[in-house]
Amino acid sequence: MTATHPDSSHAQYPPHFEPPHSSTWRLFFGPGLVRGAWMAAAGFVLGTLLVLVLRSWWSWDPVWNTEVVLVVGAMVAAPMGFLGGIGAFDYWLYYISGRPTRPEDHSGHGARGWRDYFRVNTDHKVIGIQYLVTTFVFFVIGGLMAMFFRAELAQPGLQFVDSQTFNGLVSVHATLMIFLFIIPAFAGIANFVVPLMLGAPDMAFPRLNALSFWLLPIAGIMFLASFIAPGGAFGAGWTGYAPFAEGQPLGQTFFNMGVQWAGASSILTALNFLVTIITMRAPGMTFWRMPLLVWANFTTSLLVVIATPFIAGSQFFVLFDRILHTSFFTPEGGGYVLGYQHVFWFYSHPAVYIMMLPGFGIVSEVISSMSRKPVFGYRLMALSLMGILVLGFSVWAHHMFVAGMADWLRVPMMITTLLIAIPTGIKVFSWTATLWQGRIHLTTPMLFALGFLTMFVIGGLSGIYLGSVPIDIAASDTYFIVAHIHYVLFGGSVFTIFAGVYYWFPKMTGRMYDERLGKWHFWLTFVSFNVTFFPMHYVGLRGMPRRVFDYDSAFGDLNFVISIASFVLGASFIVFAYNVITSWVRGPVAEANPWRAHSLEWQVSSPPPIFNFDEIPQVVGGPYEYGVPGARHAVMSPAREAKEVPA
Amino acid sequence: MRKGIVQLVAIGVVIGVLVTLVAVLFQWLPTSATEEFDRIQDVYWFATVMSIVIFSLVAAVVVYAVWKWRVPLDDDADGPPIHGHTGLEVVWTAVPAILVIALGIVSAVVLSENGRASDRPLQVKAIGQQFAWKFEYGDYGDFESGELVLPVGREAQFTMEAVDVIHSFWVPQFGQKMDAVPGVETTILVTPTRTGEFAVICAELCGLGHATMRAKARVVTQADFDKWVKEKQA
């Protein structure tokens, strides 16, 4: 049977479905950013009134409490108003209220012009690009913040900012990079690629997918808005340890609530990926024929769904301590200070894998197709992801070796932490074995993948140091930690994001990026990254604690070098931005399959058709059968004609 | 093939030597001033040797592969379809497992030695408060001091207390670090091995003055320590 193109039914709607109103009416009352803006304002007013009415009803003094008004009005009601306004709930509200719904209406699906990227869109490819563009905007903002406080750190003493602003910059930098860049950038790449790789027309829940995306800018704006709060941005670090965070100025609330929106976005997307991967695989696409990127996102989604509620809980408890005067983490009221850290790290350690496993998937795709060889040990690669998933939940307290937690917990946590090196090592060795005797195409994505491979090994090895309790006791809370996490999250995650963006750029945009500029970007980034972050191991071990605006003058010279290198690192992004933007506008038109890769996304046009596949592909073999004579991953013809060949 | 292996090993050795030079030519760790840090440094060197070997191995294969098997971008042949090798996979599962378990055992032994208090250690209470440290010497009456003074060669047991938020007691040359947590009593042992002046640094972000929350630490001879105590008691 041949799948009908769902778009072809579009013209058959009865006339009464046509919007009955004038264009001005639609501008203000139809779904879109204009309605989003006024409904956000209306939400704020309603939320504020609700607070004031209830407080005066119960005669609480004072009736006006800025923090409560902000939490209810600005951080709950206004975002809900915004989401309603842009139309994220329209379909469901129509359904609930019994008004006619149009399940086959695809007018909100796919992009016909640039405006379609600025509204609720149910096409996973549009959403993927929405995610990526949004997250790169926040990457730039977070990067500029880093360069700002690196300018402050170029010399000991205070030069440019005051102490609270410094703490705010450091905290918001980390928060944006984690919650608004690395996690959602991977979600963006996966959004675009995973349904295509599975042979599916879209994600399982396209409207939920659209909602997941629009939750994200809310979180980002909330984190940024904390800078205009009285008292300045939240300055307790991205870890927001209690009880310090509970005594912080108003800005801390923006963190507590922003994390909820970002977390909700992650959870909904992860659920969507899980259902999509379980139920929407094309005929013949067994789990053992899925590309490793799909495996990686499957594992990541499990991590997200299980772990993210814990950070939501930890931030709600802090918020309750702040505004409801509970005592979860205040010892005077019987609270347990270390309880915060246990709950927080029960999310935030798995979060490190949430920020790394999708990158593992990207690198497997890139290294395999650019070496023209099957991924070495495909099954063990997938199983090691699962191993990391399981072990990842048993190591959280290694962030607390000096926190004063129960002594007996340290050795077991150290053992599980060190054991994670085994599945991670399997992956690293398998990638190097994939290179062996390959025919290596040193394209930009491949450069970033190889850069990742070497830098991630450094980050992993410094992780071994930190996993060992005695070394951790000496190195914890110092710049050694800052070096370690940047080798893992920049040399690891960000390099893989760049690899992924370059690799799928022709598929996403239908145009080719400039290879020469891509190589410049890689080498500038690679060198300045190392000059920025490698010396941090040294200053940390020698005695420079993290999160300080002032430090021993003995570290002055090295910090100056680090700051200069960080500016070069920041500038290297300009090469990327220029390359991507100009190539997107007027780059050479890309072929459907410029890398001659086997997975399904390359078997359709660039960019893919609006519903991905004009006919359902029949998967007949593994995705990496490079060099196997006559091997195919899929046949793009009707299912019943396909012949099964052993994988 | 044999020539290839020799070349690969040569690259690995060159990288290994370079990385080893980086590891030994710079003094990465502060000069130890305690028995505890001496032991921690042994673990550090164990981990460093392990890291040098693993990094050199991976980097050598990457460099060798790119040097040996790089093809022009318009090359359209495929590599050999090698799907895996069970023996190799067993080796690179087992060898790292042995290495990390060895590191784990060494670490656990050192941790236990660094945590075993002798009969009568010098009791010092370290009190962290935004943004200063205070030290109390319960054995010598109830005086307190803004500077930390320890006799050389005598084990000191610190009990941490935090008045407001979490702080962290750290002297880089002591190698030991422990958070002072409101409502939780934490302890740490330090046995100074040389006299000198050091800095007590707060290592946990605690507020606007965190960067400047420092105290002076002095390790002195027993005689000087007794003299200092007398002055303080007076």
Residue spans for each PLM region:
Chain B
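N-terminal membrane topogenic signal
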Residues: 1-10
